[in-house]
Regions:
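General structural feature for long, well-ordered alpha-helical segments within catalytic domains
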Residues: 3, 26-29, 33, 58, ...
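Short helix-loop-beta connector
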Residues: 42-48, 146, 167-169
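Glycine-rich phosphate/pyrophosphate-binding loop at beta-loop-alpha junctions
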Residues: 27-113, 175-192
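Short glycine-centered, acidic/aromatic-flanked micro-motifs in structured strand/loop junctions
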Residues: 19, 80, 116, 147, ...
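Small/polar-residue-rich loop-to-helix segments that shape phosphate-bearing ligand pockets
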Residues: 1-42, 105, 111-133
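Conserved beta-strand elements of the Class I
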Residues: 15, 50, 171-173
């Protein structure tokens, strides 16, 4: 922040991109993602959207998109970094700014849902649930999850299924946010 302030004071035109691109501009990508989901929903009738949430941009964009497109599909984030309250606060603040940018209705804080049961030992640190989820999806579907976001998000989805949070008639969409390239950095964790 000091460097940015110094550069601006010297006349530089600076645009700071936060970690994960998680601000109202970055969240617009997931507003558009929700637009695509709505189009596909005519065919699939999704009853829930689940994804890993950390820096907040993905979930904020999806939630702002719900307001912008008047969509009622529930969105649940599986926190990979912060406790439930902190994560929900971060998502709400980013989603609120995104709604303001879109000039649409502002969501209520109660519309933000994040679970924190699948963080494990910490951000970027493997958990047993993540390892099991990542191995399962690779083995059954040949889909690679990253250990930091999607792996923990998918572990959360499996946990929700085990906890009977869905019915047989539910059609749940899991959003894989990428990052599988980081798997090689976690080779040691999968050898246990």
């Amino acid at each position: 922040q000091k460097i940015i302030k110094d550069l601006k004071s010297n006349g530089a035109n600076i645009y700071f991109i936060p970690g994960g691109g998680s601000n109202e501009i970055g969240a617009l990508g997931y507003v558009e993602c929700l637009n695509e989901i709505i189009k596909e929903n005519k065919k699939y009738n999704f009853t829930q959207i689940i994804h890993g949430t950390g820096s907040s941009g993905t979930q904020a964009g999806l939630l702002a998109g719900k307001k912008y497109f008047n969509c009622n599909i529930p969105v649940t984030g599986i926190s990979v970094r912060f406790d439930k309250q902190t994560q929900e606060d971060k998502v709400y603040q980013c989603a609120k700014k995104t709604c303001e940018l879109l000039k649409c209705n502002i969501l209520e804080k109660s519309e933000v849902t994040a679970y924190d049961e699948y963080i494990g030992p910490g951000y970027g640190m493997p958990s047993e649930e993540m390892l099991e989820a990542t191995k399962l999806l690779a083995k059954k579907e040949a889909i690679l999850l990253d250990p930091v976001y999607s792996g923990k998000g998918f572990a959360g989805l499996i946990g929700m299924i085990k906890n009977k949070q869905f019915t047989k008639s539910d059609n749940v969409l899991f959003i894989h946010t990428g990052g599988a390239v980081s798997l090689s950095a976690y080779e040691w964790a999968f050898k246990k």
